[in-house]
C-alpha cells in the first residue's frame, strides 16, 4: 500500500509540474496559440498561391495575435508539403494552406500516395473557390463558346489548345468530351510560358487559372469565354459558365487550411473562427474577388465532407482527362 501511495504521489507531482510548465496537452490546447505558427505553402515563393497564403497569414496573425510564418515546400504536386504536415505534431502550429482540389486529385494521380488526405488531414477552414477559364486572345474573331466549338469541329486535330496545370487540363478534357472534339492539347510549364503562342493564334484557346486570366483580361489581351464553376464569379460577372454554354460542370479549385487529423477539436475550431472573422472583412472579400474567386466559408465538418466529395469527383476527372498515374 505505501508503494502505491508513493507512485500515486509521484504521478500527481509530475502532472502538476507538467501543467505548471505548460506541458500538458489540455493546458497547451487552452493556451493555443502561444508559439509561432507555420503555414506550409506547396508552391514556390512569388507564385499565385504563395501570394494568397501570405495575404491570409498576415490577416489571421492580426485577429489571432499569433506570429505566423510561411514556409514554401514545393514539389510532387503538393505531396512534399502535405506529407510534411501529416508528420508534424498535431497541435495546430503547422497548417497546410493548399488547394483542396489538388490534394484530392493526388489521391488518384499517384500510384502510391504518401498519405491519405481524408484520413491524415482535417480541414480546419475553407477560404475560397476559384474556377478555371476558357480564354482566347482579343484578336480572335471567336466571341462565344458556341463559336469556339464550331471552329474546333471544323479544324479537327489541326487545332491546339494550351494548358499548364491539372485543373486546366481537366476543364479542357471535359469540354472536349462533351463537345466531341479532336483538338490537340499542348502543355506548358506556366500560364506565362504559353502567352506568345496564345497571342499569336497558334493556340485556339487556353484553359487557365483565374488569377492569370483576369490579369490578361484587365490588360486588354484576353477575351474570356466561360468559367468552370456552377455560377458566375464576382470578379467577371459578364462571363458565362460552361453550364450556361451547354457543357454542364462545376469544376473549381478551392483553398483550405488543413491540419493533422489528430489535432484537438478546440484548436481546429479556433483556426476556423479566425478564418471566418477574416473572411468577413471587406478588403479580404475584395482580394478574393480580384483573384478570380468567391468566398467559401464552412465549418470544419462541412469542409471535411467537401474534401471527401472532391476525392470521389477527382477519380472521374482523372479518367476523363486521361491523366497517367505517377
Residues of each region from the PLM?
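N-terminal export leaders
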Residues: 6-10
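A ligand-binding cleft/hinge motif common to bilobed small-molecule-binding domains
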Residues: 101-112, 169, 173-178, 205-237
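C-terminal segment of classical bacterial N-terminal signal peptides
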Residues: 17-26
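C-terminal lobe and pocket-closing loops
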Residues: 129, 213-280, 309-312, 326
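Paired acidic/hydrophobic, glycine-rich loop segments that form the ligand-binding mouth/hinge
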Residues: 92-98, 161-162, 204-208, 223-226, ...
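Hinge/capping helix and adjacent helix->loop/strand transition within the periplasmic-binding protein
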Residues: 87-93, 108-193, 242, 254-287
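N-terminal (or domain-start) structured segment
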Residues: 28-119, 157-158, 167-168, 180-204, ...
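An extracytoplasmic/periplasmic, membrane-proximal ligand-sensing/linker region
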Residues: 34-36, 177-178, 265-326
Amino acid at each position: 500500500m505505501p508503494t502505491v501511495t508513493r507512485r500515486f504521489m509521484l504521478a500527481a507531482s509530475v502532472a502538476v509540474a507538467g501543467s505548471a510548465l505548460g506541458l500538458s496537452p489540455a493546458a497547451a490546447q487552452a493556451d493555443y496559440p502561444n508559439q509561432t505558427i507555420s503555414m506550409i505553402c506547396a508552391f514556390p515563393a512569388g507564385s499565385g498561391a504563395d501570394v494568397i497564403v501570405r495575404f491570409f497569414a498576415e490577416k489571421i496573425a492580426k485577429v489571432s495575435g499569433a506570429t505566423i510564418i510561411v514556409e514554401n515546400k514545393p514539389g510532387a504536386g503538393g505531396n512534399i508539403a502535405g506529407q510534411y504536415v501529416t508528420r508534424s505534431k498535431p497541435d495546430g502550429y503547422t497548417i497546410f494552406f493548399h488547394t483542396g482540389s489538388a490534394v484530392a486529385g493526388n489521391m488518384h494521380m499517384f500510384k502510391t500516395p504518401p498519405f491519405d488526405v481524408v484520413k491524415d488531414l482535417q480541414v480546419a477552414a475553407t477560404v475560397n473557390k476559384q474556377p478555371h477559364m476558357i480564354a482566347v486572345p482579343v484578336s480572335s474573331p471567336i466571341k462565344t463558346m458556341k463559336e469556339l466549338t464550331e471552329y474546333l469541329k471544323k479544324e479537327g486535330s489541326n487545332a491546339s489548345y494550351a494548358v499548364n496545370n491539372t485543373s486546366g487540363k481537366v476543364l479542357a478534357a471535359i469540354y472536349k468530351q462533351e463537345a466531341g472534339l479532336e483538338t490537340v492539347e499542348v502543355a506548358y510549364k506556366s500560364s506565362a510560358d504559353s502567352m506568345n503562342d496564345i497571342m499569336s493564334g497558334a493556340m485556339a484557346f487556353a484553359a487557365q487559372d483565374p488569377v492569370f486570366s483576369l490579369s490578361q483580361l484587365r490588360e486588354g489581351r484576353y477575351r474570356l469565354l466561360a468559367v468552370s464553376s456552377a455560377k458566375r464569379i464576382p470578379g467577371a460577372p459578364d462571363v458565362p459558365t460552361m453550364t450556361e454554354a451547354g457543357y454542364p460542370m462545376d469544376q473549381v479549385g478551392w483553398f483550405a487550411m488543413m491540419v493533422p487529423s489528430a489535432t484537438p477539436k478546440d484548436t481546429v475550431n479556433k483556426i476556423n473562427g479566425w478564418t471566418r472573422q477574416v473572411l468577413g472583412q471587406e478588403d479580404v472579400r475584395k482580394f478574393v474577388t480580384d483573384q478570380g474567386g468567391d468566398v467559401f466559408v464552412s465549418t470544419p465538418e462541412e469542409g471535411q465532407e467537401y474534401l471527401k466529395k472532391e476525392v470521389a469527383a477527382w477519380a472521374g476527372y482523372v479518367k476523363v482527362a486521361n491523366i497517367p498515374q505517377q
